[in-house]
Amino acid sequence: MTETPARVVFTTGFSRRYTGGVTEFAIEAKTLRGVIKAMDTLYPGLGEHLEEETTVAIDGEIHEVGYFQPVKPGAEVFFIPKIEGG
């Protein structure tokens, strides 16, 4: 039996820049690192942007750094662009 893929979501601005405007993806991965690798496979070079330019929320809980954070089947993984300040 196949597990329900995670729902990976990007903001509109981020998706315009890196994924041709696509804001949602269904990705099968057990950890956040697996999600990032899968997205990098779909869009080469995207993994670096995800690691450097975003914070991630998994099922509504924000994780600053968490490559090994578990991603449960059916989870929502939302990449939030970091806000730069001055």
Regions found by a protein language model. Give the residues of each.
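Ubiquitin-like/PB1-type beta-grasp interaction modules and other compact soluble beta-rich domains
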Residues: 1-85
